[in-house]
Swiss-Prot record:
UniProt GO MF annotations: 1-deoxy-D-xylulose kinase activity; ATP binding; D-xylulokinase activity; protein homodimerization activity
Family: Belongs to the FGGY kinase family.
Organism: Escherichia coli (strain K12)
InterPro entries: ATPase_NBD, Carb_kinase_FGGY, Carb_kinase_FGGY_CS, FGGY_C, FGGY_Carb_Kinase, FGGY_N, Xylulokinase
Classification via HAMAP family: XylB
Enzyme Commission numbers on file: 2.7.1.17, 2.7.1.-
Effect of residue 6 to A: Loss of activity
Gene that this sequence comes from: xylB
Top-rank taxon: Bacteria
Protein name per Swiss-Prot or TrEMBL: Xylulose kinase
């Protein structure tokens, strides 16, 4: 048996995995986010630990944990958890979706002109390094007391094992890691007036970083089992769905849309707002494009058009008048990350006439989200990734009609697989399983999810969509000056 813990933003999820790789028990505990000022997003690390402790005890009530061999941790990335020399938390953790430090991003890139080469990424307010610069500038008395900086899941590890440790995939999201070398960058740390001594030790995702402290093991009804490094949420989620080898790729359609592709070497294209991070598996990296509003656009449009829900919206789109002039939708309801890196980007309908009604608007929304997802996929492929097929997961991927439309727009074979909703906790448990079974291959331990349906792009429809995609791109560029 193996345990996977996923420290999310809205809750902690813990799962129990058997030797066959099946989830036999799961528990979730809710978390809340504090927003004391505009753009701020914070959580109390003590809340993380209390929720994890409750979830683990509930899991133990559901199923004996005596046979657990190892435990893995995944979690929300980028959060800045600041500790003093007595391991006390100095202030609430500043989360990945906190937007206060845009100025510090500009300042850091000016201080280290080669930062994009070292980190493989554009400096963004979500990342950890600019948050520390903000603390130094606005809370100097707190900054002076910092002994260690930990990422959210690694604070849980400290409470479980007493060890200061992190994994490569999560560390890559700090902007302090030399992503190609898989080591801390002294240049990036010095730019924030920090040193290696204030950073956790680095491990690969399936390496053991320590063991459960006796008092924690006793409280959870377990042995003092090894704890593995684990991974950031996206990398751990990818491990869970079997994204192991170079050129394997997955498209996750949730509130946001994430396109994740594995590479065997370090590739980057920071100017396109593609994230380039280490994978949670050794000698592997990954590229990731992020669309901020994917399935959330469908929820919004269903309400806007008076349709009861997303399935009704998709049914309406299928009834759209084929002879009507096309309508375009720019799906930037929360700004956009890849490829525009523009928090000021806005949503737009364009091309409306008296011919158009709710059905045509519904179709435009599905197509517009598809065009934006394809833009994100294209910039990842431009880095040198060549997937044969793309695994499609997430709640937004349930519609067969929309899945086929996405294949036709992108020109990619899309393989819809079920079971991806377990999320990063599954990847964390599988990383623990790898550590406990060194004699077994990754292919054996990390199978792909069951295939439900493959969607091949229709050549005719693909050809018809390309000029519309070009208009979609031109629309954004033409409207850009008005979006500031």
């Amino acid at each position: 048996m193996y345990i996977g813990i996923d420290l999310g933003t809205s809750g902690v999820k813990v799962i129990l995995l058997n030797e066959q790789g099946e989830v036999v028990a799961a528990q979730t505990e809710k978390l809340t986010v504090s927003r004391p000022h505009p753009l701020w997003s914070e959580q109390d690390p003590e809340q993380w630990w209390q929720a994890t402790d409750r979830a683990m005890k509930a899991l133990g009530d559901q199923h004996s944990l005596q046979d657990v061999k190892a435990l893995g941790i995944a979690g929300q990335m980028h959060g800045a958890t600041l500790l003093d020399a007595q391991q006390r938390v100095l202030r609430p953790a500043i989360l990945w979706n906190d937007g206060r430090c845009a100025q510090e991003c500009t300042l850091l890139e000016a201080r280290v002109p080669q930062s994009r080469v070292i980190t493989g990424n554009l400096m963004m307010p979500g990342f950890t390094a600019p948050k520390l610069l903000w603390v130094q500038r606005h809370e100097p008395e707190i900054f002076r007391q910092i002994d260690k900086v930990l990422l959210p899941k690694d604070y849980l590890r400290l409470r479980m094992t007493g060890e200061f440790a992190s994994d490569m995939s999560d560390a890559a999201g700090t902007m302090w890691l030399d992503v190609a070398k898989r080591d801390w960058s002294d240049v990036m740390l010095q730019a924030c007036d920090l040193s290696r001594d204030q950073m956790p030790a680095l491990y690969e995702g399936s390496e053991i970083t320590g063991a459960l402290l006796p008092e924690v093991a006793k409280a959870w009804g377990m042995a003092t089992v090894p704890v593995v490094a684990g991974g950031g949420d996206n990398a751990a989620g990818a491990v869970g769905v079997g994204m192991v080898d170079a050129n394997q790729a997955m498209l996750s359609l949730g509130t946001s849309g994430v396109y994740f592709a594995v590479s065997e070497g370090f590739l980057s294209k920071p100017e396109s707002a593609v994230h380039s991070f280490c994978h949670a598996l050794p000698q592997r990296w990954h590229l990731m494009s992020v669309m901020l509003s994917a399935a959330s656009c469908l929820d919004w449009a269903a309400k806007l058009t008076g349709l009861s829900n997303v399935p009704a919206l998709i049914a309406a789109a299928q009834q759209a008048d084929e002879s009507a002039e096309p309508v375009w939708f720019l799906p930037y309801l929360s700004g956009e990350r890849t490829p525009h890196n523009n928090p000021q980007a806005k949503g737009v309908f364009f091309g409306l006439t008296h011919q158009h009604g709710p059905n045509e608007l519904a179709r435009a929304v599905l197509e517009g989200v598809g065009y934006a997802l394809a833009d994100g996929m294209d910039v990842v492929h431009a880095c040198g990734i060549k997937p044969q097929s793309v695994t499609l997961i997430g709640g937004g991927a349930r519609s067969e009609y929309w899945r086929q439309m996405l294949a036709d727009i992108s020109g990619q074979q899309l393989d819809y697989r079920t079971g991806g909703d377990v999320g990063p906790a599954l990847g964390a448990a599988r990383l623990a399983q790898i550590a406990a079974n060194p004699e077994k291959s990754l292919i054996e331990l990390l199978p792909q999810l069951p295939l439900e349906q493959s969607h091949l792009p229709d050549a005719q429809r693909y050809a018809a969509y390309q000029p519309r995609r070009e208009t979609f791109r031109r629309l954004y560029q033409q409207l850009l000056p008005l979006m500031a």
